[in-house]
Amino acid sequence: MERPLRVPEQENDGGACWACLKHKRACDRALPWCKVCREHGIKCTGYEVRLSWPDDIIAKKRQRPEPNHHRRQSSSKSTQSPSSTTSSTRSDKRAMPSVISALNLPAEQSFYMQHFLQNIARVALAIDHQGNGYRSLLPMAMAEPAVLNAALAVAASHHSRWQHTADDVSRKYLGLACKALRNRFIDPKLRNSPVTLASMLLLVSYEVFSGSSRWKGHYDAIRGWIRGRQGNKDLDSFLMNWVCLIDTQSALNLGTSTMPELDEWMSAAPNNQDYTVDSLFGCSSQLPKLMSAASRLYVASKQDLVDEDDIRYQADNLQKRIRSTQLPEDSQIKVGLACTDASQEFSTTVGMERDELRRRAMATAEIFRHASHIYVYRIAHGPMEPLSPEAQESLETALTLLTRVPDALGPGANLGWCLVVLGAELDLEEQREYINSRWAGMHLLGIYNTKNGQSILNEVWNRRDLVSSGFADPERWQDTMQRIGQSQILV
């Protein structure tokens, strides 16, 4: 997938909301809205990334001749009331950046595309950086109805949850996206295009962000699509990474096998001397392929495909490989993807100082590593067996590292799977309350697979308490998840 349109972001490294930045106030960075703005009686304009568009594109819009119907409307403008003029002025201040208008999107679509680029692109991955793959979808969306309508459906649905309003728009765009996607599958020339994959991935996100299990139907289609085409040279590394994230999460949580085709994709990650963090997952770029291996070991254990001694032997070897992905405290991390050998210097576009974001990114990557250690340990040991000293150390270290990622801003948005894995080991009430407080912060993002994660973990705790009292048999959290009818991507 080509990326002909670069999408740079306006600078805001101070961590303040845009209103505090404008008025030069000390922002408290509270989510979802800054309390300082409320104290000053103004509406907080949020922390979202704002796009700065190339002057040559803006100039094209200015040079475009004005359509005739604008002249017919000019007389009616003079009859508008002062209140309507004021309202119009306010609307203009909130308008989509000029490049979107230049691409002729209607007002409603412009609004939701802005929301997708500024907000969803920021919270739907671990590290929002200048190479954010969600924003690189813009040129494709402007040219392809399937991608455009799928992105608008995701944005409209998310916006309604974020603002706690009725969602009476997203289904319209969802229907249009599905219709356009169906037409692509009918046409052999379009069926195997990366555009088709991007559209299906956005439909997965629509369902996952809504907390629905319907994402599985879309992902089954993606699996068939990948197996039915030859090669992946024309696929963008971000799309490939996106597929790997869903595939790995599905396998880890549901006890299914990962796609063997994806192992080759994830083998492109640079060696760990570069200390590269995967911007989509939030972990070391070498860890996703090991998480995939862990899911296969879990399947082998669950289906009794190998004996217990062999399971423990393979688990020990996998633990060593996971340990090798450790990021030293003083490492200068880079940002990359598991499906490419390219990486870039650490950069930040989120409202946070660069060093602070780097510390959070490193802590998040290490939390993923420790959670993976515990996950693999539980493959070879029963759900209520005491943790080994090494696994207990991983649990305690991960809980300490969570305090370095104090909220859902930036890398903290991607910790749902880790919270479930770590939380499933906790019995102390104060520790459980802390984990629930982390869920509450993540719910503010409006991505409701976090609510699935919390309900799964609460049921796991109920089961642990019953087991401790002698009223139930031990159960893995994955089995609890399926017993209560949950099947979700937790990252």
Residue ranges and their predicted role:
Residues 200-209:
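Internal, conserved structured core segments that host functional sites
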